[in-house]
Each structure stands twice: as structure tokens, then as C-alpha cells.
């Protein structure tokens, strides 16, 4: 699926993550800012990439500002951002949840 509009989910509070999705052209590209990037960079990207795959998103620019979020928080924020970006917020795809 193509991203229809830029969308964001999350906050910059401690133990949260802010994810912004916008249209991409060359696959999925990441701009990740995190104090724990050295240790969890790959895990954060893998979680978000898996959510994008569930929705069939192949091209996206992903900006992530992580403040120590747990994996389940990252997944929930990614799902919210994707639904908003695809204009599906009013009609969530329950099968991917």
C-alpha cells in the first residue's frame, strides 16, 4: 500500500517513542534517534519494519525518536502511525492486530 499522507504517533515522554511516517521511494529508510541505539537499533527497526509489512507498505521514510520505549509500545505506535498514514484510522484492520 502507498502512504497517503505524513502521519505521526507517540510522544517525546520518557519510556515512549515518536514515529513519523511519510512517503518513500526506495524501500524503507530510517532516521533513528535514541540513547540506546547502539544496543537496540536493529530491534527497533525490525519491529517497525514488521508492522509496515503487515500493512503491505514497501516504501516509507520513517523518523523515530526513541525515549526508551519497550517493544510493545514501539509496535503500538507504529501501528497507529501506519493506520493514520494509510487513512485507515477510522477502519482499523483487526486482522493485523
UniProtKB/Swiss-Prot annotation:
Keyword Phosphoprotein in record: yes
Alphabetical keyword list: Cytoplasm, Phosphoprotein
A GO term from the CC aspect: cytoplasm
Subcellular location(s) of the protein: Cytoplasm
Protein origin, superkingdom: Bacteria
O-(phosphoribosyl dephospho-coenzyme A)serine modifications at: 14
Main location: cytoplasm
One matching Pfam family: ACP
Functional description taken from the UniProt entry: Covalent carrier of the coenzyme of citrate lyase.
Summary of subunit composition and partner proteins: Oligomer with a subunit composition of (alpha,beta,gamma)6.
Family per similarity comment: Belongs to the CitD family.
Protein name: Citrate lyase acyl carrier protein
